[in-house]
Amino acid sequence: MNSAPAIQKLLDELERLPGVGPKSAQRMAYWILNTDRATALRLAQSIIEVKDTVHFCSRCFNYAEGDVCEICASTKRDGGIICVVSEPRDIPPIERTGVFGGVYHVLGGALSPLEGIGPDDLHVAELMARLGSEDVGEVVLATNPNVEGETTASYLARLIKPLGVKVTRLASGLPVGGDLEFADEVTLGRALEARREL
């Protein structure tokens, strides 16, 4: 796109978004240019509003507009079960299942010695404080099934188990509709280990 300076500035900013390359940025820029002014302003205002009003929940570190997030504030949630996730973006997929009725704790990342991320860089101390002050019977470790997530889950399990709190890990295995021939050995091994009686 042979761009005016304002268009080039928009393209440069759009390309900074995760997963957006030059072509996607160009499509978005064209859409913004071709849409009516009111729609473009609503988009801009939404971005400003979310940056001005959304912050971290003081209890679980999920996104919130008030002091605590809607999940922590709900009287319908079971505060005795805490699901530990790495990032706030991990909560919506779990919520969409409609299966989990407890509350969450967001670590703000995962342990990664290679990247210099240790326990003090995450919300581990805050989790331990919650376990000491709230009546929690179970902690579900829902970190990602990668090296960092497994390391984080193992570390947390070692910290939490001595408190007498039940520690569980999300089962990992084969996706529904998947074929065995395409499953990697680790996934298939975990599926076998987490098998259940019918």
Which positions does each model-derived feature cover?
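Catalytic cores of large soluble enzymes that bind and process phosphate-bearing ligands
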Residues: 2, 35, 39, 115-119, ...
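Long C-terminal interaction/binding lobes of large macromolecular proteins
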Residues: 128-140, 144-198
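Residue-level signal for pocket-adjacent positions within structured domains
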Residues: 27-28, 42, 55, 67, ...
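Conserved, well-folded catalytic cores of nucleic-acid-processing
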Residues: 13, 17, 35, 50-53, ...
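Extended interfacial segments that mediate partner engagement and assembly in macromolecular machines
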Residues: 25, 74-143
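Solvent-exposed alpha-helical segments within well-ordered globular domains of core cellular machineries
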Residues: 8-12, 26-30, 41, 45, ...
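Cys/His-rich Zn2+-binding cysteine-cluster or related metal-binding knuckle/ribbon modules and their
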Residues: 2-8, 16, 26-91
